[in-house]
Structures are given as structure tokens and as C-alpha cells.
From Swiss-Prot:
This is Protein Rev. It comes from Human immunodeficiency virus type 2 subtype B (isolate D205) (HIV-2). GO terms for cellular component: host cell cytoplasm; host cell nucleolus. GO terms for molecular function: DNA-binding transcription factor activity; RNA binding. It is found in: Host nucleus, Host nucleolus; Host cytoplasm. InterPro entries: REV_protein. The RNA-binding motif binds to the RRE, a stem-and-loop structure present in incompletely spliced viral pre-mRNAs. This region also contains the NLS which mediates nuclear localization. These overlapping functions prevent Rev bound to RRE from undesirable return to the nucleus. When Rev binds the RRE, the NLS becomes masked while the NES remains accessible. A motif (Nuclear export signal and binding to XPO1) lies at residues 69-80.
């Protein structure tokens, strides 16, 4: 372990200790007492973050070696071309050998509207009024007439 790694480990241990010394406030009390505890906890947390910035400033440049390794790895990457789609895409999937068609070329099946949903259109405004009750084809209404039951006292 180099001296720089040792210093970094020391700083990280110190920062971890600082964060452990400020647990989230818990306990009984009125709403204002709990609110004040949370405010004090938040202020202490901000002070810890400011102290952490002073302990470990990230302005130091990283070592040259890892950057060179990362550049070499990026240079070794290649982009492969997608294979041409197979000519037998229109066949049913049971006649094809499983796994021979890459997922990029899977055939999309269009969705069809459900046949049993009478009155449900794309716009909810176009729904017919007979959706709330039984059959309305005979012209009867399910709504109660307010004048009908006025005999109650």
C-alpha cells in the first residue's frame, strides 16, 4: 500500500466516524420538539459535510497509471454490426429452431382491441351511458326518479 492510499484510508475512516456520530433523531415529544431535533440534526450534518470537504479535498488529480489503463481498455473495445434479419421471419415460431433468431429481430405482434368490451373506445368521452347498469336497450333508465318516493316521512 502506498502512502497516498494509506492517507486516503485514514481520511475515509475519519469521515465514517464523523457520520456515525450524528444519527437521525428519534424519540418522543411534541411536533415542535421533533421538528427542532431534525433541524439541529440537519445543521450538524451540514457542518460534518463542510468538515469532510476540508479533510479531503477532491482537487488532487488521480494517478496517471489508472487513466492510461482506462484509455487502453477503451481503445480495445469494438462495435459489432447487427446480423441481417433471417429471411424466414414470417414463419411461425414453432417451425423455427429455438434460439436461432436474435431478440433484435423478433417479430412484433400487433395488439388487437378486446372484442368483449362494447362501448369502450379510445376516448373515455365516447363511452355510452349504458356502462353503469344493466341493459339499456329497452329505453329504461336505472336512475331513480326523485318524485317517485315522496311518501316517506
Amino acid at each position: 500500500m502506498t502512502a497516498r492510499e494509506g492517507d486516503l484510508q485514514k481520511e475515509l475512516r475519519l469521515l465514517h466516524l464523523l457520520h456515525q456520530t450524528n444519527p437521525y433523531p428519534q424519540g418522543p415529544g411534541t411536533a415542535s420538539q421533533r421538528r427542532n431535533r431534525r433541524r439541529r440534526w440537519k445543521r450538524r450534518g451540514l457542518q460534518i459535510l463542510a468538515l469532510a470537504d476540508r479533510i479531503h479535498s477532491f482537487s488532487t488529480a488521480p494517478a496517471e497509471e489508472p487513466l492510461n489503463l482506462a484509455i487502453q481498455r477503451l481503445q480495445n473495445l469494438t462495435v459489432e454490426d447487427l446480423p441481417n434479419p433471417p429471411p424466414n421471419l414470417n414463419q411461425s415460431p414453432t417451425t423455427q429452431a429455438p434460439g436461432c433468431v436474435p431478440p433484435v429481430w423478433d417479430q412484433l405482434v400487433p395488439r388487437s382491441a378486446p372484442s368483449g368490451s362494447k362501448g369502450y373506445g379510445r376516448n373515455s368521452c365516447e363511452c355510452r351511458r349504458d356502462l353503469m347498469g344493466g341493459s339499456q336497450e329497452s329505453g329504461e333508465s336505472n336512475h331513480r326518479d326523485p318524485q317517485e318516493n315522496q311518501t316517506r316521512t
